[in-house]
């Protein structure tokens, strides 16, 4: 049998290294270990490695092979092992894996206690650079925000809206997804719920009215709570308020340190 040419392993003469090359948008079923146990989801993966200047291409099929051979659930330690395995399989010195997935949490309505699910967007990332591993967690948490100015100047009522608070953090050890959700939901004007009956709707309306927050208040309060956690080395907090009285959003961001 004739030998099949391995073009990607040939020499490239342009003397241009590539920071990240690999696969993006790879969708696979995955089990995530969380504080409540284990949750099955569908993940969207981006897997990349650094490519030296002299190598023409990476081995794209090896990324897929690595994930198809993956066994067990994903958590902080498993992602670190997987990132290391990727570098070995691709013969690379640096690489990154990002896993984005919907995360569901069961919540009880504040008055009736009716149970429902609420979804959150989560991304776990592991990166090895210069021999050092770094883990990051990103969670997008929807909350209600009610405008303090609108409340102050109005004879009755105040404009309120849904807000997305995005926390991206780098930690020295595992931080549970639920911990970040709890932390952020405590800082909103009110939490969101998948299902509410009339007594619950009355409660959340009045609760938000009693806890008005500007977008600036939101990011400052969340950042203050994150700074108190010794496991967290650095973080970014973003809040986007989808203004109910405008056709644009209010936005704020804090980076620490």
Positions of PLM-derived features:
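N-terminal intrinsically disordered, cationic/polar leader segments
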Residues: 1-257
